[in-house]
Amino acid sequence: MKTFSLCLVVVLLGTTSMFVYADVDCSSVTNPPTVFFVNGMRDDKFAAERIRDKLKEVYYSYLDSLPNQSYVTDEMRCVQFLPAHNQNEEPWNELLEVFLQSIPDDTVAFWQWIDLIPGVTVPEWFRNAQLALEETIVSAFAYIVDEDLQQHIDQYAGTLGKRMVIAHSQGNFYATQANVLLPPDLRIPVFAVATPEGISPSLGYLTHDDDHVINAIRLVTGALPANAAGECVEKDDWTCHGMKESYLRANGEYIARHILNTFFPPVLY
């Protein structure tokens, strides 16, 4: 009986922690703002949830860092973060294998070329294979699973209150297509991270200048130009494309501020 009681206490504490943050009872906040995180193709369901948790952690840390804590309302502290998952598809893995098998021994020169360093010649193997790869590249990034897309649409349409999407990599195609299919009054604002698309969504975008993946496919997909310095740590993320390892590490505060300002625009006097 004692063991059962202890387990019950643990469960209740765990449940309570889902609704209370920094002494704020979020159950009293009606329809709290919602951030949907849409993962890229390399992230399975569990990885997407870990990134969602990191995004949430970064946001709350940013709130705690604000010098004027009297400005921080209960609603700000009760923003909820939900994953809008899409499947990890084989075309992406196949594409990476093609690149890895083709990269010459001098990988430094290869990535210098990918980063468009002046004076570095396009590798012959890539120039010869480029046309053959175009179809694979586009299909790998633009591939959309209908069941996943419908789930996204249902999530967005069924959520009350303020909403926004943070989409990473190929997840931007899902966010864009969901808004195409949603009625105008239910469309959801999107902030794009490492987007392979060529059009900026309503809340803008963030792409690092050292993102090897986006740099590699820009000529094919028409991806938007880089607009931030990444300062990638390649031992943690050799592609410099990871949401958690690269983008939240380098620009977590910027992303958190973007969330806050989207839901609670600063008042200008």
Segments predicted by a language model, with ranges:
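Lipid deacylating catalytic domains
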Residues: Y21-Y269
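N-terminal signal peptide c-region/cleavage motif recognized by signal peptidases
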Residues: T15-S17
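Bacterial N-terminal signal peptides that target proteins for export
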Residues: M1-C7
